[in-house]
Amino acid sequence: MASPFTRIFSDLHYGDRSSTLRELASLRPLLDGPDRVIFNGDTLDTRPSRHPERVAELRGSVLDFVQHHAPPATLITGNHDPDISDVHALELAEGEVLVSHGDVIFDDLVPWSRDAAQMGRLMREALATFSETERATLAARLRAMRRAAAQIPQRHHTESDALKHAIGLFTDMCWPPTRVLRVVQAWRDTPRLAAALLAQHRPAARVFVMGHTHRAGVRQIGDGKWLINTGAFCPPTRACVVDVSAEKLVVREVERRRGVYRIGSTRAEFSLAAEPATVTLAA
């Protein structure tokens, strides 16, 4: 009998025309098999919008789908859905695996965004409401980030009009002019910042599973420490799932065929029973 396992993926961005996810039902093959599912942030955009009725509709659709068509599920918050639940991080495999959306590693949440300076300020203000002792904890940092994210309004993200969405997306991609450089710099900084977060807050964890940067991959970030990014359902990036059981962790690609998402090839496999963890990477 196969061991029970939890499946993790992130950054569906449902309701955003930038996402390839048009129908929630197309996720069903990904939900066939796991005993539990974790949606690791940015499942949709719940922030203030010029179209609140659209946000409410999308939110209702997601919650209904998760309740009726998925295994027991946990929705972890992200910077786009800071109020989707009160869960900001989870630990699996007796603390071996830390799961969080990933923006927690950045002081300004989304350093490539035109809102980065404002988010950094809001983050500092939110952290200041905690005691000095609390500010040193991961829980306080995550709560402060969600407060900050909830105050940043959407731009084009749930715009249903194709032309308006395209204009908004183009503007976001081109402004500020340094945006591409900021994205690349964030990619470069991510392994170092993720390693620092584990060292400070979860030194016993051997694997950090995140999304946020839309760059799927598996990377060693220290002696026996690994960073796994599940990518996104938004081109040109690809999405991955992470399956975690008591004995092992497996990273698999997500393939989209005829509008339906399915499990693809294995990218990496970790034996959590070994000390240190043994890792097999796909060629």
Whereabouts are the PLM-identified features?
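Core catalytic region of metal-dependent phosphoesterases/phosphodiesterases
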Residues: 2-9, 14-96
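A short, terminal or domain-edge coil/loop segment
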Residues: 88-96, 126-142, 261-273
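Conserved beta-sheet core of the metallophosphoesterase superfamily
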Residues: 90-122, 187-252
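N-terminal short leaders/motifs
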Residues: 26-54, 157-165, 177-205
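Long, positively charged, glycine-interspersed low-complexity recognition regions
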Residues: 16, 56-59, 218, 227-283
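Active-site-proximal loop/helix segment associated with metal-binding centers of metalloenzymes
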Residues: 102-192
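Short, basic/low-complexity N-terminal boundary segments at the transition from targeting/disordered tails
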Residues: 64-76, 193-207, 280
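Flexible, glycine-rich phosphate/dinucleotide-binding loops
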Residues: 46, 82, 106, 236, ...
